[in-house]
């Protein structure tokens, strides 16, 4: 065969591997027919993935918009309670790492004292989470209102704005902070191949009771098997998981 006036040969070994992986029914073809079959199969797969992502984004926009409207009374009551308790800011913004390492600003209802970030450095030796995350079951930085809204995951509701904006999805791995990502092993970085979400597999399977390695394993499992049906099932499982309060601290 020729291309641009130069002779080249097909990599027959590569074609055989591609054929073995993608061909069905025992049909034996060779050369360009194998290559054409593979390209067609790959193109169809890309089209399905693109369509699924588009539908997922539509679901994110609709779900976050409806959620913001229906939960507006909860927003108002929570904001008032936070303000009354210590007079500090209602919301807490923090840089998080999204898909492919993109940094974005994620929002929560403030559940800790105003100087919580500075206090964290003095508590690092009491970290109860394995891996690169920081978790304490009895974190002294959490306020009285904060304990309630964290138990019911109300503190996460402002992230519906992040979903509406497109920084996050309703379902996907929880977005890590840059300091955690800096300590990731290469295998851990697969979590960054997806848009982060409000809920995920480990959020409905024990939340903070699951160690870092377990969270990564479940996130990768979601990456390799994600579907709209699976997302809907995860959203439905999130409701009883939140109400139970298991692993929330």
Residue ranges and their predicted role:
Residues 1-69, 249:
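N-terminal hydrophobic signal-anchor/signal peptide
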Residues 39-49, 124-129, 139-142:
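Short glycine/proline-rich turn/loop motifs
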Residues 46, 219-223:
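Acyl-group handling in specialized metabolite and lipid biosynthesis
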Residues 80, 93, 108, 141-144, ...:
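Residue-level recognition of specific faces of alpha-helices
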Residues 92-140, 199-217:
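Short, glycine-rich, amphipathic interfacial segments at transmembrane boundaries or analogous
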Residues 132-195, 234-242:
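A short, structured surface patch at a secondary-structure boundary
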């Amino acid at each position: 065969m020729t291309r641009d006036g130069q002779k080249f040969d097909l990599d027959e070994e590569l074609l055989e591997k591609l054929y073995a992986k993608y061909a069905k029914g025992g049909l034996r073809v060779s050369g360009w027919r194998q290559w054409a079959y593979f390209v067609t199969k790959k193109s169809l797969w890309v089209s399905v993935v693109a369509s699924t992502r588009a539908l997922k984004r539509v679901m994110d926009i609709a779900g976050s918009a409806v959620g913001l409207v229906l939960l507006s009374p909860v927003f108002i009551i929570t904001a008032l309670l936070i303000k009354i308790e210590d007079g500090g800011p209602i919301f807490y913004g923090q840089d998080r790492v999204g898909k492919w390492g993109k940094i974005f600003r994620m929002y929560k209802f403030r559940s800790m004292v105003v100087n919580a970030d500075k206090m964290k450095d003095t508590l690092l030796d009491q970290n109860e989470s394995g891996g690169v995350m920081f978790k304490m079951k009895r974190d002294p930085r959490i306020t009285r209102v904060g304990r309630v809204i964290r138990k019911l995951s109300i503190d996460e509701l402002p992230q519906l704005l992040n979903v509406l904006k497109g920084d996050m999805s309703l379902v996907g791995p929880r977005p890590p902070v840059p300091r955690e990502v800096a300590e990731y092993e290469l295998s851990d970085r697969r979590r960054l191949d997806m848009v982060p979400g409000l809920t995920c597999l480990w959020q409905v399977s024990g939340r903070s009771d699951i160690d870092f390695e377990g969270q990564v394993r479940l996130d990768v499992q979601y990456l390799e098997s994600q579907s709209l049906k699976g997302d809907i099932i995860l959203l439905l499982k999130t409701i009883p998981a939140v109400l139970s309060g298991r692993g929330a601290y």
